[in-house]
Amino acid sequence: MFSALIPVSPLNAVKTRLKDFLTPDERIELIKNMLLDVYEGISPICDKIYVVSKDKEILEFLKPYAVIPIMETENIKGLNDALNYAFNYIEEDNIIITPADIPLIKKENINNIVKECKENSVILCPSRGGGTNLMVLNRSSIKTRYEGFSFLKHIEECKENNINPIIFPSFYISIDINTVEDLGEILIHGGGTYTYNYLKKLNINAKPKHSSAGRFEVIRQNTE
């Protein structure tokens, strides 16, 4: 049996690197749409889905969905503390940890990943920036070491516990959304997702570039 655990930061602090491109309310709607894409990608595979957050609004938003909310207490500091706190509420042996900002994740990705799972194994999917965008583990196998270059930290943690981690590179899972350029990946590869449709609603588009300056430019059209 597999469960999924999705940690979500307080909405007033999400995606600050997009603050010059999206308003605070737009950034909140962006994270909600990305979260729905992640939910749709993992829900066909997982027996239960847990979301851990300090934010009442995000947990309230998820009430119509088959999600088990876990409200963090005020004394929890950081992502690893939040995950360890959430583990106390999870009954399933195998846990898929995934962030809320990888909206290109697909059911097929999760299917292929869980097929690799063995007893007491750890599966790691790296992000483009050195982080860990998805991890499958038994809660007793290793400690989570998110923040910074967590992909390398998790490999080190596995070695310290005599576990040979299974590395599962995935283009779609590797794309997390933090910058304006990241939005372009959704506009190119994410047709049909909640996130894609939301960006289009905001009149945001990706314009191809034919130079060494980059593959594309993300623009927002003024409709006034």
UniProtKB/Swiss-Prot annotation:
Family of the protein in this entry: Belongs to the CofC family.
Swiss-Prot/TrEMBL GO biological process terms: F420-0 metabolic process
Entry EC number(s): 2.7.7.68
NCBIfam families: F420_cofC (TIGR03552)
Quaternary structure annotation from Swiss-Prot or TrEMBL: Homodimer.
Principal EC category: transferase
Keywords (A to Z) from UniProt: GTP-binding, Nucleotide-binding, Nucleotidyltransferase, Transferase
Pathway: Cofactor biosynthesis; coenzyme F420 biosynthesis
InterPro entries for this protein: CofC, Nucleotide-diphossugar_trans
Pfam families: CofC
Single GO MF annotation: phospholactate guanylyltransferase activity
Catalytic activity, as annotated: (2S)-2-phospholactate + GTP + H(+) = (2S)-lactyl-2-diphospho-5'-guanosine + diphosphate
Top-level taxon of the source organism: Archaea
Function in brief: Guanylyltransferase that catalyzes the activation of (2S)-2-phospholactate (2-PL) as (2S)-lactyl-2-diphospho-5'-guanosine, via the condensation of 2-PL with GTP. It is involved in the biosynthesis of coenzyme F420, a hydride carrier cofactor.
Record's protein name: 2-phospho-L-lactate guanylyltransferase
